[in-house]
Amino acid sequence: MGTIQEAGKKTDVGVREIAEAPELGAALRHGELELKEEWQDEEFPRLLPEEAGTSEDPEDPKGDSQAAAGTPSTLALCGQRPMRKRLSAPELRLSLTKGPGNDGASPTQSAPSSPDGSSDLEIDELETPSDSEQLDSGHEFEWEDELPRAEGLGTSETAERLGRGCMWDVTGEDGHHWRVFRMGPREQRVDMTVIEPYKKVLSHGGYHGDGLNAVILFASCYLPRSSIPNYTYVMEHLFRYMVGTLELLVAENYLLVHLSGGTSRAQVPPLSWIRQCYRTLDRRLRKNLRALVVVHATWYVKAFLALLRPFISSKFTRKIRFLDSLGELAQLISLDQVHIPEAVRQLDRDLHGSGGT
């Protein structure tokens, strides 16, 4: 009996071992399947840590057991399967050069990855340059450099525009008095000794209207007679003096008043001289001229202007205006600062009586 019972027990033990063998094999296969599932999980997105509700710490054995218990034994390749959409944070690229306080670290940074594998961008962990750090890019702007500088503007051009510093007097060894006018890159030397009696031909008559509309008077009664010695030399330097003085007196627009009364025919300059004056006159002076007012124009003055029309522009011709008396001139501009020669006043009284002025 004892032998039969022992044999039965051995038989039961063997049957149990045989029955447990498939379970052990299934458990081994299940473990292999888990390993394969973990390897495949690198290719497929996993559940969010908040949704899984488990810790993903690889050193926590309890977490491994719970993850193994919740991992499916098969992959459902067909049908609807809840998948988490993987969001990748954009790379943060700063095109800044290396600063002195970065310790060799490049300022070009990418979004840091969190230890749990999520793609949340931690703004507080990004390194930003402090206010005390200065970049060595060489493109920093100071308060003085924000406005462009006129580097190409020379001293002579600045003086010409401002009307200061472009004229000085020089005395020669022979006692001649010279005046130098600097007009841009050019310098004009004027023999003031020979033109001293004729300097009154050009004068400043104040301003007209709003702004800086200067009034320039040209009194032809002060011109030299053509019978004097060195007439061409005197007229050339007189023209230089008039142009240089205009550059000093005229800042913007101006009104030129020609007082032709009291001028003899011997004082009328030749046509070639007037044509040369017009061509040599700076374009700025021709453009800024608002009007040329001719007072007491005689027939030969009008004939002169008619002969000059082929050589002057139509715009300049339309700027010419003729007045018959000083009274008409007083209605156009103020005569308080205008110096009118006595010969012109006498002619106006002879033509219009005492009420002319």
From Swiss-Prot:
GO process annotations (BP): apoptotic process; negative regulation of cell population proliferation; regulation of growth rate
Taking the record's annotation, the residue ranges forming a coiled coil are none
Q: Where is the composition biased (Polar residues)?
A: 105-117
PROSITE patterns recorded for this chain?
CRAL_TRIO
Q: What does this protein do?
A: May be a bridge molecule between BCL2 and ARHGAP1/CDC42 in promoting cell death.
State which tissues express it.
Isoform 2 is expressed in placenta and lung.
Q: Which domain of life is it from?
A: Eukaryota
**How does it associate, per the subunit comment?**
Homodimer. Interacts with BCL2, ARHGAP1, MIF and GFER.
Q: Where is the composition biased (Acidic residues)?
A: 119-134
Stretches with biased composition (Basic and acidic residues): 32-49, 136-149
**Keywords (A to Z) from UniProt:** Apoptosis
Please give the name of this protein: Bcl-2/adenovirus E1B 19 kDa-interacting protein 2-like protein
